[in-house]
């Protein structure tokens, strides 16, 4: 069970906490509130930091959907998205769902798997609002879904529950930042203090390789070691990150 402080003025907060197994604690580090019909996580000892929510409808993700480069983006190349090929993807470390949304907006069917209950609650709330949106709601309902569980233990269960045959498993485990690196974005500071680094991330590769029929893609900082010490088949490098691609079979239409 995860302790959380929440504003009891909102009955939907109580139902959300009951659904996700969250326990009221007046001394908790984090607070869940509804602001303008959006479930938001606040770090209580840093009130100047912006709260965290999942928004697939507006803001940065909407801008990227419209102007982010389409299929020319590195993430699209990494998962094998091309003319006539629209892979089904399991995002095994969903986080705030941004990479999953990019892939869904490009036409992929994406199942998000998230093990942290608070993050899963934020994702579900983001999906709720996206499903109701007049512009993107139709294809969001068809392409994006959520499973709450650990990808180390439950990856195959997630795919089975959604009746999904998986072409690609996508992983972006939280990696410790270098001490000398620039200050982490304020929003990510809140997120990282909640979930911490994925110290068991090496355990993700084997179940991902077992589930994916075509490839596994691992997003890593440019300075990070290969996941579980396994060299990828190919690497797609960006300015600060890289996509390690473990190929099992060709991507065909």
From Swiss-Prot:
The GO terms this record gives for MF are:
rRNA (guanine-N2-)-methyltransferase activity
What EC number(s) has UniProt assigned to this enzyme?
2.1.1.242
Q: Does the keyword Glycoprotein apply?
A: no
Subcellular location, record wording: Cytoplasm
Stored Pfam families: SAM_MT
Which reactions fall under this protein's catalytic activity?
Answer: guanosine(1516) in 16S rRNA + S-adenosyl-L-methionine = N(2)-methylguanosine(1516) in 16S rRNA + S-adenosyl-L-homocysteine + H(+)
**Which keywords does the record carry?**
Cytoplasm, Methyltransferase, rRNA processing, S-adenosyl-L-methionine, Transferase
The task this protein performs is described as: Specifically methylates the guanosine in position 1516 of 16S rRNA.
- Protein name, please? Ribosomal RNA small subunit methyltransferase J
Q: Which gene encodes it?
A: rsmJ
